[in-house]
Amino acid sequence: VYEVFSHPEVRRYKTSICSKASLMMLFILALTFIPPLFVVYRSYGFWRKTDYYREYPDIHFKRELLLVLELQQEGNYVTYSTFQKYNQLQNEHLRVPLITSRETDTNRDGKSDSLIFNLEMPLLDSENVLGVKLILIFDYKLHQFSSLTMESIAYANYDAIKPGGKFEILGDLRVNQKEPIGYRGVDNRYNTSVIDSTSVYAESYDFINIFKSYTSRNLTTYLNAPYMVWSTGRGASQPFVISATINYAEEQFLYTPGFWYLIKWGWVQYVSVLLIFLFFFDRVKVFIYQNQLVPTMVEKPWREEKLK
């Protein structure tokens, strides 16, 4: 003899609306569905007010820069910028270098992956470079959530003991974020000039003043360049050379999620805890009504027949 098929029989418990059995069912339902909300909420992860996502920013070098080369003579320097007003202010110290730059797209995704920059500054044989201050200006865009556009910079600084003939930079353009960005809309708050090129005052082009204004932003970029090489010695009539390779890296951004993301995340957590409560209180209901701890009318799926 073997079991060929089986299925459960349904036993129904009936009662009036105003009865102990109805009140017991309401009480059990409340204990089933409400406590999971408190459990998930107290775990400090129910509503994700902020979250992270990764995006490969769209970056382009704007071919704008500000350069100061500090010379061995005390207080002496040579400089160059792409800003006409600044060049007019620095007429005595101004030198015009030879600049070449190109951006590469190695993975062919339509976005630049790196900047290869080269600058040759003509100097007199008596002029020896001991320090470099360089600001490169970029156009920085995000598209995945909010459409964000801003002007950003990469700053390189080096002070040497011995005069140099070449300064090489290898690094990444990274982002620094203070507050979350939105998940949709257009954000052009920082799409303004980092350096006020219309100003005729020397203070506007001072590095510390530029950085004070720039660092007040929520989003800024900086040059992460652990590998800087200072080569000493420069041949007669040879220029001072600055060579830089700056990679554009994928970044992680903090943002404020939308409503449906919050619902989706909260629902997943709530249901995972609710299943445990459903399983437990289902057993409680079976015990209470099967043992008639509260009076009900039992409707069985079969008829009891008296033995003859």
Report residues per predicted region.
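N-terminal pre-first-transmembrane soluble regions of secretory-pathway and organelle membrane proteins
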Residues: 1-94, 293, 297-306
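Short, charged/polar micro-motifs that form catalytic or ligand-binding hotspots
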Residues: 20-24, 103-108, 270
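Eukaryotic basic, amphipathic alpha-helical target segments in cytosolic regions
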Residues: 38, 42, 125, 140-146, ...
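Non-cytosolic ectodomains/luminal loops of secretory-pathway membrane proteins
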Residues: 48-255
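Long, compositionally biased interface segments
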Residues: 218-308
